[in-house]
Design a protein with these regions (language model features):
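C-terminal cap of thioredoxin/glutaredoxin-like
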Residues: 7-22, 51-62, 139-228
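Structural alpha/beta surface segment adjacent to cysteine/selenocysteine redox centers
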Residues: 47, 53-146, 216-228
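A short, compositionally biased domain-edge/stem linker segment
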Residues: 23-33
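Asp-based phosphoryl-transfer active-site loop
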Residues: 41-48
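A short, charged/proline- and glycine-enriched loop
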Residues: 34-41
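N-proximal short alpha-helices
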Residues: 32, 67, 71, 175-178
Length: 228
């Protein structure tokens, strides 16, 4: 096949994919309107995942800028080697990469300790499980993951609840929800059949919501605008 033929083939594939995506989005929006549903965005975050922490930093601003129903789910890492080969090495690279990205974005990262207080991990998850059905859960989750990735041992300790819930069951249930929707990774946002991973994809979701007329009159704040 000549170079010209390859280029034409690539262009055709791009156009077909764009048209298919547009058609799927139109169908999803029609179904949403017919059902009278809100614009539902599901956020899947993992306590041990620094990418989840960086994404979580912007989620309140996303909810403030767009008329959406933002649902939070705390998940656990998928240790299947088919999805995450060499998980220890991946975790090390994630910490290093997120430290650099956090510095660029001006997000505090392990500024109160050299490492997350992993000794409190299980107790913290159990404490969050005890309020999973409370309207306070989103704020508590975001505050907890912030304390954890700032290395704030004292802050995490204050969040531990003696009357904690069943964190394992909560994680397993949320992981099943994530899998049923067709994904396995954390730091992901799901909206109308599509996935947006990490901070760098957040603007794509924001643009899609804006195109659907879901933006609030005041528009995106400075924090969201800063990641473009």
């Amino acid at each position: 096949m000549s170079i010209g033929s390859k280029l034409r083939s690539t262009l055709v594939n791009v156009l077909v994919n764009e048209r298919t995506q547009s058609a799927k989005r139109a169908i999803a929006e029609t179904r949403r309107k017919l059902g009278g549903s809100a614009h539902v965005v599901s956020a899947f975050l993992e306590l041990d995942d620094p990418w989840s922490y960086l994404l979580a930093h912007y989620l309140p601003d996303l909810a403030a800028a767009y008329d959406i129903e933002l649902r939070y789910y705390l998940t656990q890492s998928c240790n299947d080697e088919g999805f995450r080969p060499q998980p220890e090495l991946l975790a090390q690279y994630a910490d290093e990469d997120c430290a650099r990205v956090a510095a660029e974005l001006g997000i505090p990262f392990l500024d109160k300790g050299a490492a997350p207080p992993v000794e409190h991990r299980r107790a913290l998850i159990d404490s969050l499980a005890s309020i999973a059905d409370s309207p306070d859960f989103p704020g508590e989750l975001l505050d907890a993951i912030t304390d954890y990735w700032r290395g704030d041992t004292a802050g995490v300790s204050r969040r531990l609840d003696a009357a904690a819930g069943d964190g394992r069951s909560m994680l397993e249930e949320n992981q099943r929800r994530l899998t049923d929707l067709g994904h396995y990774n954390s730091a992901t946002l799901h909206y109308a059949g599509e996935w947006y991973w990490g901070v760098d994809r957040l603007t794509y979701l924001a643009d899609r919501l804006a195109e659907l007329g879901a933006g609030r009159p005041e528009g995106p704040g400075a924090k969201l605008a800063s990641i473009r």
